[in-house]
Amino acid sequence: KNTKESIKDKKRELMMFAQSTDPLMFYLVSPISGKKIRNLQHIAHTEKTNEFFSNTIHFIKNNNYHNNPDVLVFIYGFICHFVLDSKVHPYIFYKTGEFIKDDSKTYKYNGLHHNMESYLDNHMLKKHNITKINLKKFCFSLKPFTKELNKVISYSFLKTYNINNMDKIYLNSLKQMNFFVTAFRLDPHKYKSHIYRFIDKFTPPKTFKLEAISYN
């Protein structure tokens, strides 16, 4: 079956899974014990990434899920994120430098990475003549995962990173990210940006700059 045809009605889900493990940053159900999950967001970008894809693809193949659209948008979304990061991040780091919390020499780069990503987002929107976009409707579909998709997510993260119940954790993280985008990030009139900028004046140089999260 043609893959493009099989997932044509899953565009929102594809966009959602193209965020890969980034939603794990918003796993605040348990602020302290959840730190392991929040750290996984970065670990999954830098450690055992090929192993994760290999484990996932083999599990899909061995269980005959290769024609399951819900499973396909998950793996294709994660691959899209991996390819984009691999291609774009070197350029972003080249332009903005790298902020390292324990290195005071890099404090001048604080927030620039996020600002550059927002700039590239806006550039792509302008290029495609898109004047308005609703992030929630564009890339969030928070329906419960199918049984097959739950199995794929659970197996892949357990096999690769030895973490249980990732199907539930990942969906929970998406829900919290969805709330965060609405409450703190969407800023069409730039009111939040002014508030964040004011707060940033009183925070230490190594603290993440809130202004970077404002998105209009």
Task: For the regions a language model picked out, list residue spans one by one.
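N-terminal leader/auxiliary helical segments
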Residues: 1-77, 82-216
